[in-house]
Amino acid sequence: MKKKISQAIIKFFKNENLIIDESKLIIEKSKNFGDYSSNVALMFAKQNKIDSLKLAQTIKNQLLSENLNLEKIEIAPPGFINFFISKNEYANIVSEIIQKGENFGRYSLQKKINLEFVSANPTGFLHLGHLRGAVIGDILANILEFSGNFVFREYYINDFGSQIDRLVSSVFSRYQQIFKKFALPEEAYLGEDIIWCAQKFFQIYANKFENSSLDDLETYKIFREKSIEIFLDEIKADLANLSIKFDVFSSESELFRTEKVQKNLANLPFVYKKEEAIWLKTSKFGDQKDRVLVKKNGEFTYFSSDIAYHFEKINSNFKPDFLINIWGADHIGYVDRMKAALKTVNLNQKLDILLYQLVKLFKNGQEFKMSKRMGKTFTIKDLLELVDQDAIRYFISERSYNSLVEFDIGLAAKISLQNPLFLIQYAHARASKLLANSTIVPEKILKFEAENETILISKLKQFEEIVLKITKNYKINLLNKYLLELANLFNSFYSNSKIIGNQNQNSLLSLTKAVQIVLKNGLKLLGIKAKERI
């Protein structure tokens, strides 16, 4: 309905050759002044040299002549327009939801999107920081696909460079400590996961490398490849335990092995040589300064492989219309340089980067602080022992990606209406139980009169708007907020309405069915089970 009203107003302005900025047209949900209201007449009266009340009246007359299923339109000084939806429209909304079922809220946007997320270094178990990126990425992919887009989910394995050297020396040292005293390197990773990995080595190779050294190339190669493999297998297992899937795991080292880094940089414009190093003039395209691609010793920088990786994604067989990268907020310094690199070859429209903030974990009222360097990390494995997958996905996604998440383990595990996820699932279970013991007669005409019914139906219709909004701003938390509001409205309706035995029973059961459908659709997008009973 909101879309219909907007389109009708825009059509009116264009037909009358009046000035309107469509981006500033606002149709707001209203409780006290009709179902929807707009200040469009106030906004554009001056530009069109028309009195705002007169413009509002003209808009009213035009819209009433169109088939918008509006009961009435009222004008309030100095030019507000209030729209009242016809009672028939509420019945139409409920019928539409039931008829479309699991397809209610879908669109057909038809864009190809490469979505890269998680991309954690294979140097240990996934922790809470990685978890947030994983959940955001997976839910966003679900919503983008639900909207009719084609989404290619990609994990970039950073298996090249100094962090891998640190991993190898750390695991090798812990392996040596199984047999004898052996000093840890100064920059060693200190986590329990490194000790675990070394024990895995011992299970596979026994004492084969007891007297070996990393100076031996074959020993180094085995420790490098096996350490990455062991941790990558664990990363994949953790993601699977959260029902998070990928279409491909791409390797940074593979880019170098196949010389794709060199090939992609060979014809890059705005490259110059200075101080025996090779630079890219990113400052010309919005970066703070130019960036080194190849050091004076001939070594490629991380930036060079990142550029090559993005070019590979863009030129892949998938041929994406645009890319989305989901990175931790600590990568903020990389955003401008990466976008600048793509601008050098006119690909700046191809990349959106979401920077998500940290997760703070609270346990028994105390914050559990993480430090991988000191070996104190709270991993996904740890969290899954305390709360289930559904709770993790809900509480990690309930805040905007650019806001801090405070994850309360106690609340997430609580079977109580204080727990927002429990409340939503409780509403779905309530609806399911009622419908399981009742019969809806599809042929009967639906009728909705009570305010709590029409408010609930209006909220149901908003599901479409929420889905579309998320495809534009990527704020998946809007879905959590919406589902909680819908569940609260339904629980109130359920508690304050006599449904079975009501002379309008069939309509109220149909409304309950519509609520069940929308809750289930929304929870499915979050990757959460819609429980039939609690």
From Swiss-Prot:
<keyword id="KW-0067">ATP-binding</keyword>
<dbReference type="InterPro" id="IPR036695">
    <property type="entry name" value="Arg-tRNA-synth_N_sf"/>
</dbReference>
<keyword id="KW-0963">Cytoplasm</keyword>
<dbReference type="Pfam" id="PF03485">
    <property type="entry name" value="Arg_tRNA_synt_N"/>
</dbReference>
<dbReference type="GO" id="GO:0004814">
    <property type="term" value="F:arginine-tRNA ligase activity"/>
</dbReference>
<dbReference type="InterPro" id="IPR001278">
    <property type="entry name" value="Arg-tRNA-ligase"/>
</dbReference>
<dbReference type="Pfam" id="PF05746">
    <property type="entry name" value="DALR_1"/>
</dbReference>
<protein>
    <recommendedName>
        <fullName>Arginine--tRNA ligase</fullName>
        <ecNumber>6.1.1.19</ecNumber>
    </recommendedName>
</protein>
<dbReference type="GO" id="GO:0005737">
    <property type="term" value="C:cytoplasm"/>
</dbReference>
<dbReference type="GO" id="GO:0005524">
    <property type="term" value="F:ATP binding"/>
</dbReference>
<feature type="short sequence motif" description="'HIGH' region">
    <location>
        <begin position="120"/>
        <end position="130"/>
    </location>
</feature>
<comment type="subunit">
    <text>Monomer.</text>
</comment>
<keyword id="KW-0547">Nucleotide-binding</keyword>
<dbReference type="GO" id="GO:0006420">
    <property type="term" value="P:arginyl-tRNA aminoacylation"/>
</dbReference>
<dbReference type="InterPro" id="IPR008909">
    <property type="entry name" value="DALR_anticod-bd"/>
</dbReference>
<keyword id="KW-0648">Protein biosynthesis</keyword>
<dbReference type="InterPro" id="IPR005148">
    <property type="entry name" value="Arg-tRNA-synth_N"/>
</dbReference>
<dbReference type="InterPro" id="IPR014729">
    <property type="entry name" value="Rossmann-like_a/b/a_fold"/>
</dbReference>
<dbReference type="Pfam" id="PF00750">
    <property type="entry name" value="tRNA-synt_1d"/>
</dbReference>
<dbReference type="InterPro" id="IPR035684">
    <property type="entry name" value="ArgRS_core"/>
</dbReference>
<keyword id="KW-0436">Ligase</keyword>
<keyword id="KW-0030">Aminoacyl-tRNA synthetase</keyword>
<dbReference type="InterPro" id="IPR001412">
    <property type="entry name" value="aa-tRNA-synth_I_CS"/>
</dbReference>
<comment type="similarity">
    <text>Belongs to the class-I aminoacyl-tRNA synthetase family.</text>
</comment>
<dbReference type="InterPro" id="IPR009080">
    <property type="entry name" value="tRNAsynth_Ia_anticodon-bd"/>
</dbReference>
